[in-house]
Amino acid sequence: KNIQLNLNLKQISLLNEYDKFYDVIEYCTNLLEDDPYLINILYARAMAYENIEKIDLMEQDLRKILSIDRRNANTLNALGYSLVIHTKRYDEAYSLLYKAYQFDPGNAAILDSIAWVEYNKGNYDEALRFIESSYNRDKDPEIIEHYCEILFKNKKYDTLKKVIKLELKRNENNVDLMNKLRSYQNDAKL
């Protein structure tokens, strides 16, 4: 059964690589007909729904996972972060993210999500506290981007300058991140 699940997840991964999100949804839906409680498959379908901007269906699948496993920190984080970026339901997002944080306090993605909800709520000092903690654990491009945005908003230009200089060297092959970092450089006149 584990081998079959791994094969299914590999198939889903391949479809995602080629942006075949509708195929992912169909594939997952077929698998879920046999077993509607496959958390990994529900999660994969939820992310595919998000990619085609079907946020209500994404939310439905993520909430189903939470009805099966209410302590699933990754799902709490995914749902909370999605509510931050796709809706204005910041208080609800914060509640979900704080639960995720309680279950997995060292998770850089969760720290980043909390920083982003704080940023969107206008709590820039709190956002900075969480994003610094996230950045110190993981140099994921999205975390770097959020860190720079929050540093800029907090007028921490010296730190921003150092981070940009360091990350431009580290991420020279990531064109999107390079462009974003250069735009912060220009905006802050660094």
What do these predicted regions represent?
Residues 1, 34, 68, 103, ...:
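Structural marker of alpha-solenoid helical repeat scaffolds
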Residues 2-4, 13, 38, 47, 72, 81-82, 107, 116, ...:
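Residue-level recognition of tetratricopeptide repeat
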Residues 7, 41, 75, 110, ...:
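TPR alpha-solenoid repeat register
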Residues 17, 51, 85-86, 120, ...:
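Register position in tetratricopeptide repeats
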Residues 30-31, 64-65, 99-100, 133-134, ...:
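Canonical positions in the second alpha-helix
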